[in-house]
Amino acid sequence: MTSKNFLSQLPPVLKLWWWIISLVVAFLPLGLHGLIIINAIFFALVIVVERKLKTFAIIFGWLLFFFWFNIVVNGFIFLPNSSALASQNENFLGHFIYSGGEQFGGVSWWSVNTRSLLRSLVIALRISMLFATSFLLTASTSIYELAFGVERLCTPLRYLKIKTQPLSILFALVFKLLPIVKGELKRIKQAQAIRGFKYGKLAFLNPVKLKTLFIPVLLSTVKKTEAVAFALQAKGYQLDNPNKTHYLQKYNLWGGIVFLGLFVLLSCLLMVNNWHLVYWTNPHYSFTFTHQNFCFFKQISSPQLLAFWQLELLAIG
């Protein structure tokens, strides 16, 4: 059952479009400030939809996990050049928290600096945006609404003689069964713990212990899938009936259009603002250089190096 809130009153097709656009926007050059703004909006929507802080804490915990994970990874990517001056390294990488980068045994030391921290934060914000928008879609949309919404969204495929009904039911089941799998996994672990089974720390690294969960979770999920299929049929959804109907529901169409339009407008404004800051105004916005960015690009003679720096700007910003 989905809770009654603003998002649950929007048409499923518009929510699917919003979800697809959000997946695309998450990888566009919004800039650090833009990603923080959109994540703050998504987190506020998560709290409004869930009406408690548990889900927000879970998504925020994943954000912190990916932030620290990317710090470790980027510490091996953005290394100071031991043959360059300290001022040149600082212009390229920003201030050092740990000034590694020296060669020892042919291997560079791990380093943490401003550039690696910014890149790690940007990647973590992009991932948390994906988590938040997927949760908002599933929490505000019932399974039969998802099925009918995907079927309507894939209507152009009918002209190519592609059946959209199996695709829609598969999409709906995948989205709705992910929380069920998590709940069944927790329930079975608690049942095994009552019987004296001890997982201990770092049990996810022990495949022998995990094997005791695979079969029970699989069987329980299959049973839930059958129950979901019966629920869909009870709501009027049948794959072999091309003239199927379902109960009419009132949706806030204009509210959905305004919501989707404002999100697209905000994303475009943030991208334009980031493009202006990074390329023309402030060279210290996404990374540090002593010259303006466009002047720095003009001084690069290698096309491959120029393309690399432009992609680097998009990745960070």
From Swiss-Prot:
CDD domains linked: EcfT
Chief place of localization: membrane
One CC-aspect GO term: plasma membrane
Location relative to the cell: Cell membrane
UniProt keyword terms in alphabetical order: Cell membrane, Membrane, Transmembrane, Transmembrane helix
Transmembrane segments: 18-38, 58-78, 92-112, 130-150, 165-185, 202-222, 253-273
Pfam family, one: CbiQ
Membrane topology: Multi-pass membrane protein
InterPro entries: ABC/ECF_trnsptr_transmembrane (IPR003339)
Family: Belongs to the CbiQ family.
The protein's name in its UniProt record: Uncharacterized protein MG302 homolog
